[in-house]
Amino acid sequence: MFEATTILGYRGEMGGKKFALIGGDGQVTLGNCVVKANATKIRSLYHNQVLSGFAGSTADAFSLFDMFERILESKKGDLFKSVVDFSKEWRKDKYLRRLEAMMIVLNLDHIFILSGMGDVLEAEDNKIAAIGSGGNYALSAARALDHFAHLEPRKLVEESLKIAGDLCIYTNTNIKILEL
């Protein structure tokens, strides 16, 4: 279900300034065939105050995006309240409970994973989250680079996704990054 991509979210503070970034590769795979190498799976929401990215079924992911964006607008960009309401609304709709997609949403203060089952997970360290087939590779690389290297945030996201792209056959190194 989550083959064909890697999405990495990273937030924190450097030099007294908060940052938030999301990056993703561009590969779309259908079975054992790459059908697109430069897809965009990340976007900014709510007047460029929230970043998001998806992994999984494209149609299901757009359903997730639409639903989350509507809730985010109604909560005037409050990410924490939006993810709570997202989960509540999700549990009420039997159709939504079967979506085969996941999302990462983040701003300067929070980072969450939203699942196609209606689960909302805050990143363990409230700093780094990854989803998709190469997510564990990207997460491991990002944690190591965050802990031991003093890289600029954009470089950390880029290098972590490159490592995932080198290891995961469903992830390429055609990387796109958005930042707040």
From Swiss-Prot:
The entry's keywords: Allosteric enzyme, Cytoplasm, Hydrolase, Metal-binding, Protease, Sodium, Stress response, Threonine protease
Superkingdom per UniProt: Bacteria
InterPro entries in the cross-refs: ATP-dep_Prtase_HsIV_su (IPR022281), Ntn_hydrolases_N (IPR029055), Proteasome_sua/b (IPR001353), Proteasome_suB-type (IPR023333)
Molecular function terms, GO-annotated: metal ion binding; threonine-type endopeptidase activity
Regulation: Allosterically activated by HslU binding.
The keyword Glycoprotein is annotated on this UniProt entry: no
Reaction catalyzed: ATP-dependent cleavage of peptide bonds with broad specificity
Similarity-based family: Belongs to the peptidase T1B family. HslV subfamily.
Protein name: ATP-dependent protease subunit HslV
Species this protein is from: Helicobacter pylori (strain G27)
Lineage per the UniProt record: Bacteria, Pseudomonadati, Campylobacterota, Epsilonproteobacteria, Campylobacterales
